[in-house]
From Swiss-Prot:
One annotated GO molecular function: ubiquinone binding
Assigned GO CC terms: chloroplast thylakoid membrane
Family from the record: Belongs to the complex I subunit 4 family.
Lineage, opening ranks: Eukaryota, Viridiplantae, Streptophyta, Embryophyta, Tracheophyta
Protein name, UniProt field: NAD(P)H-quinone oxidoreductase chain 4, chloroplastic
Database matches in InterPro entries: NADH_Q_OxRdtase_chain4, NADH_Q_OxRdtase_chainM/4, NADH_UbQ_OxRdtase, ND/Mrp_TM
Highest taxon listed in the record's lineage: Eukaryota
EC number from the UniProt entry: 7.1.1.-
Length: 500
């Protein structure tokens, strides 16, 4: 067994290294940028090395386990560990955060604080995916709130204070339910409270209590995911945030909610999950149609992409609700796939805004010829979003489809109805995606727009776009690269629903 604290180093390195930024020269923007990027690259290399040489793919148990006693009073430990469910989101976090710091290169105002907040988010995100203690999970969950609030309120658009306040109210409200659920699970059934995931997996609860706990956790995760009707903070937040912040929100933050649903609601509260899974499938199906229809009516480019993210989260809900190894693996693949695609679309939307200073689609048009590189990359990621075969979005959605069809939990007529409605949502996706492309890149409006600086993508922006596009194509061509990480863990997780 390896006793080197790889995960502790990976979790604390960004925030501790980021704190040094606050002592760097105030006017050394270039130094701050390169320092932050180097820290992110070092973190990503450490993570990749630890996983490649110390993680066994065929072992579904928790690996790289670290357990340090923190507070004796209620058995609170610094417990970290990874399995096939968490390794994908951790690698996604490292990859997207590294590219987001490169995307934030134009930020010059208060750049020390900006880059420190990005690194603080990095630690919180990896800490959440690696935590094996419920209270530590909650602490890492809360660690996201202040950095995102400050990034929104200080580097956002004209309505940044409104969107930041709305974000903090929604997420803090959801955190209350998460804390109540953590305390309820930790304090039940024992004279000595325990918050250890390994112990809680085998804990049984009265049906009524388990349902109450499940609902509490679900509300908390539904805000972050987001799940309708708790999604209204997302379009406002994306509409005002800097595009590097949007990359972190769409690529990682939303996936934390989906991860929580699998890790806590599904793994710890399996009996309640089997009761509520049909409702998850129904809500996910409605979400696909509703968000796709709403996206089509959005004038604001970033809000249209935000609603497309809400729509794609519906597939994750359906996969989680299928209680089927195929469907759940599809949901995990969709978490990774949409992390790449959503981050790329917001990055390209932000770079386009930097040039034309327009955000409303009906004011755009005609930028395909002067900006062919941005047009090509935006079109490519739009195709990935609408699930074009050969790209990651198609594989993830197809596996979720197959999972719900082959699920033994639902009647044939129910499965046919669900797949029919899902198919309608998939038809709506190219409608809003292609109309967005048409309004942005075709026509002649832009040539008459004042104060427009129409020049194509530079090397930095092209590098970020291509770096995200490579895994989108790679997963589309060879999805087993991601599925091999989770398949054994999913099989063990679903065994709870067979024997319980």
């Amino acid at each position: 067994m390896n006793f080197f604290p790889w995960l502790t180093i990976i979790v604390i390195l960004p925030i501790f290294a980021g704190s040094i930024i606050l002592f760097l020269p105030h006017r050394g923007n270039r130094v701050i940028r390169w320092y932050t990027i180097c820290i992110c690259i070092l973190e990503l290399l450490l993570t990749t090395y630890a996983f490649c040489y110390h993680f066994q793919l065929d072992d579904p148990l928790i690996q790289l386990v670290e357990d340090f006693k923190w507070i004796d009073f209620f058995d609170f430990h610094w417990r970290l560990g990874i399995d096939g469910l968490s390794i994908g989101p951790i690698l996604l976090t490292g990859f997207i955060t590294t590219l987001a710091t490169l995307a934030a290169w134009p930020v010059t105002r208060d750049s020390r604080l900006f880059h420190f907040l990005m690194l603080a988010m990095y630690s919180g995100q990896i800490g959440l995916f690696a935590s094996r203690d419920l209270l530590l999970f909650f602490i890492m969950w809360e660690l996201e709130l202040i950095p995102v609030y400050l990034l929104l309120s200080m580097w956002g658009g004209k309505k940044r204070l409104y969107s930041a306040t709305k974000f903090i109210l929604y997420t803090a409200g959801g955190s209350v339910f998460l804390l109540m659920g953590v305390l309820g699970v930790g304090l039940y059934g024992s004279t000595e409270p325990t918050l250890n995931f390994a112990t809680l997996v085998n804990q049984s609860y009265p049906v009524a209590l388990e349902i109450i706990l499940y609902i509490g956790f679900f509300i908390a995760f539904a805000v972050k995911s987001p799940i309708i009707p708790l999604h209204t903070w997302l379009p406002d937040t994306h509409g005002e945030a800097h595009y590097s912040t949007c990359m972190l929100l769409a690529g990682i933050l939303l996936k934390m909610g989906a991860y929580g649903l699998i890790r806590i609601n599904m793994e710890l509260l399996s009996h309640a999950h089997s009761i509520f899974s049909p409702w998850l499938v129904i809500v996910g199906t409605i979400q696909i149609i509703y968000a796709a229809s709403t996206s089509l009516g959005q004038r604001n480019l970033k809000k249209r992409i935000a609603y497309s993210s809400v729509s794609h989260m519906g597939f994750i809900l359906i996969g989680i609700g299928s209680i089927n190894d195929t469907g759940l693996n599809g949901a995990i693949l969709q978490i990774v796939s949409h992390g790449f695609i959503g981050a790329a679309l917001f990055f390209l939307a932000g770079t386009s805004y930097d040039r034309i200073r327009l955000v409303y689609l009906d004011e755009m048009g005609g930028i395909a010829i002067p900006m062919p590189k941005i047009f090509t990359m935006f079109s490519s990621f739009s195709m990935a979003s609408l699930a074009l075969p050969g790209m990651s979005g198609f594989v993830a959605e197809f596996i979720v489809f197959f999972g719900i069809i082959t699920s033994q939990k639902y009647l044939l007529i129910s499965k046919l109805g669900i797949t029919f409605v899902m198919a309608i949502g998939i038809i709506l996706t190219p409608i809003y995606s292609l109309s967005m492309l048409r309004q942005m890149f075709y026509g002649y409006k832009l040539f008459n727009a004042p104060n427009s600086y129409v020049f194509d993508s530079g090397p930095r922006e092209l590098f970020v776009s291509i770096a995200i596009f490579i895994p989108v194509i790679g997963i589309g061509m060879y999805p087993d690269f991601v599925l091999s990480l989770s398949v054994d863990k999913v099989e063990v997780l679903l065994s709870n629903f067979v024997y319980r």
